[in-house]
A protein has these predicted regions:
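Surface-exposed, interaction-prone regions used to assemble/regulate multi-protein complexes
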Residues: 1-164
Length: 164
């Protein structure tokens, strides 16, 4: 199967990327804010929802980055820190402010979230190659709790230089 490559320039495009990253697994050390470049990057092990019906469930290593990031805030997670606790990405949402600006929110199971204030939507996703079979499909019972977690205050992360 071919490697997935997607770009998002509007909220609809970002919704497509969110669907492909639903149930992706990553760690805090897989996330970084590159302040000097106004870029937020991540590497995840995404569940391959596009696999043929009847094929064994599998995951793929995927990289993604947001450009034109003005500020990063987080709750329940510190991007770039060493942690063995896996994070499960439930969704990426976008709330417009003054067009074309807005806030993208990465919603994780268990109530963790990262908010990115964006000058505009410029996102790229690319599979990095490896694919492996896994046991079972993701369980979506935590989705409602994770989406409800977007509400409330998020602690402001490092918005200056280096990794947040």
């Amino acid at each position: 199967m071919e490697l997935l490559r997607l770009a998002a320039l509007d909220a609809e495009d970002l919704g497509v990327i969110s669907a492909h990253l639903q149930d992706a697994i990553l760690k805090a050390s897989d996330l970084a804010y590159l302040g000097g470049q106004h870029r937020f990057v991540l590497v995840a092990r995404r569940f391959d929802w596009s696999a043929e019906e009847g094929a064994p469930p599998r995951r793929r290593l995927t990289g993604m980055h947001f450009d034109r990031v003005l500020r990063v805030r987080s709750r329940g997670i510190r991007p770039g820190t060493e942690s063995d606790s896996p994070l499960e990405l439930l969704a990426i949402t976008f709330e417009p402010t003054e067009a074309p600006s807005g806030t993208a929110t990465l919603v994780f199971a268990g109530g963790a979230a990262i908010q990115l204030d964006l000058e505009c939507i410029e996102v790229q996703l690319k599979d990095l190659g490896p694919v492996w079979e896994v046991e079972g499909r993701p369980d979506h019972e935590a989705v409602a709790a994770g989406r409800a977690a977007i509400a409330g205050n998020l602690s402001e992360g490092n918005t200056g230089k280096g990794t947040a």
